[in-house]
Amino acid sequence: MYRARAARAGPEPGSPGRFGILSTGQLRDLLQDEPKLDRIVRLSRKFQGLQLERDACLASNYALAKENLALRPRLEMGRTALAIKYQELREVAENCADKLQRLEKSMHRWSPQCALGWLQAELEEAEQEAEVQMEQLLLGEQSLEAFLPAFQRGRALAHLRRTQAEKLQEVLRRRERSAQPAPTTAAAAAAAATAMDPPKPFPAAAVLPTGAARGPPPAVPRSLPPLDSRPVPPVKGSPGCPFGPAPLLSPRPSQPEPPHR
């Protein structure tokens, strides 16, 4: 019964089975009837599925378009802020380049070597100024009251510059010593071994002769003669000095020590 109803209902419009039962003349007439072909295509399931997909895509695109249009003011504001940030970044980069250039010039100008040269030049200038002041004082071109304060200030400045130059030279020497490469391992080990090696003793010196070997000392008289009995030599004095010349004592010859063994 169901098969009879399906046969009576016929195939689905637009399906290949529906066109298969038509004769050649009917197919030729169908090709010439465009409204009928259009109606058949529209009634097919595939076309209806594509139509539904198209409607869904259109609805989705419409929703996305509305959302994008709602975000457009925010996009414009962000674009403007980004342009401002780029401008600020460009200005900061230019300022940074300018400051780096000035910093390099300042570092070159105020380097320790340049500072040392400046101090030495100031010292020479102070010395020359002191010499000029001395010449003016000797020639009478400057009074003593005006010379003393100026000369004192100049000498104080020269002393200060000399001290600064010496300290700076010491700092530069320390930096050069610290920048030198450290000694190698072998050299360091040799230096440590040399430092740890105990010093060798000196050879024993020869024993000096004692008093017994030298002989008995000369006999000293036990009783001295009276002072009146000793002759007093005459004193010869100079007109400017009432006393005579004192006799010079000759050094006692020392015995040479024997060489070390």
Curated annotation (Swiss-Prot):
Belongs to the VPS37 family. Component of the ESCRT-I complex, a regulator of vesicular trafficking process. Required for the sorting of endocytic ubiquitinated cargos into multivesicular bodies. May be involved in cell growth and differentiation. Residues 172-261 are annotated as: Disordered. PANTHER family: VACUOLAR PROTEIN SORTING-ASSOCIATED PROTEIN 37, VACUOLAR PROTEIN SORTING-ASSOCIATED PROTEIN 37D. Its main location: membrane. This is Vacuolar protein sorting-associated protein 37D. It holds the Pfam family Mod_r. Signal peptide: none annotated. GO terms for biological process: catabolic process; protein transport. InterPro entries: Mod_r (IPR009851). Component of the ESCRT-I complex (endosomal sorting complex required for transport I) which consists of TSG101, VPS28, a VPS37 protein (VPS37A to -D) and MVB12A or MVB12B in a 1:1:1:1 stoichiometry. Interacts with TSG101 and MVB12A. Component of the ESCRT-I complex (endosomal sorting complex required for transport I) which consists of TSG101, VPS28, a VPS37 protein (VPS37A to -D) and UBAP1 in a 1:1:1:1 stoichiometry. Residues 215-224, 231-261 have a biased composition (Pro residues). Residues 181-195 have a biased composition (Low complexity). Keywords: Endosome, Membrane, Protein transport, Transport. One of its GO terms (cellular component) is ESCRT I complex. Residues 93-182 form the VPS37 C-terminal domain. It is a peripheral membrane protein.
